[in-house]
Amino acid sequence: IVEINKCLLAENKINEVIKLIPSLNIINGEVIIRSSYKDEVLIIISTNDNVEISKIKDIKNLKGIILNNKTIYKDNYFIEEVNDIKYNVAYDAFFQVNRLVCAKMFKLAQDFVNEGDIVLDLYSGVGTLSLSAARKAKEVVGVEINKNAVDNANSNAKLNNLTNALFIYSDAGDIKNLDINFNKLIVDPP
């Protein structure tokens, strides 16, 4: 492990927060910094050390702090927007980190679908590819094993008025047990 003050691949807001990490006094643990298109940040900390949270509560656009899977300050999610679709993203849910690449991927998912298609999206996460496809498809069903991501995906469908998208909590390996008829499949495994 190498201590850094800046990551050239990270967004500016993340680099601002990186500079404050040493003030948390974490000896053994992990800190994850997530940022949104609005420059909001979530800070996720996993450690048994006593953490000096007061050192980071005043960060501009701080959306929330999660310590050992418990929300201890503000929210445990942020809102992301790609190609005019908004996504609630829980702190532990996957979301593409490169917005330019993900915008192209989401557009490809939408272009892949025709009106009348019934789409099954395995490993659907918070609904990123599913909701893009739902703009054209007759129906989209997303399958995801992370319960928070499924909840986010269903609320994201409502948030974007996409009534033709439904997300279910299940292991993608169990789809043979699900009664879903589809003619298009999206697979974006972890």
PLM feature spans:
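Rossmann-like S-adenosyl-L-methionine
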Residues: 10, 48-190
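Extended interfacial segments that mediate partner engagement and assembly in macromolecular machines
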Residues: 1-28
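Structural signature of eukaryotic scaffold interfaces centered on beta-propeller domains
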Residues: 34-36
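Short small-residue beta-strand/loop micro-motif enriched in glycine and branched aliphatics
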Residues: 1-4, 41-43, 89
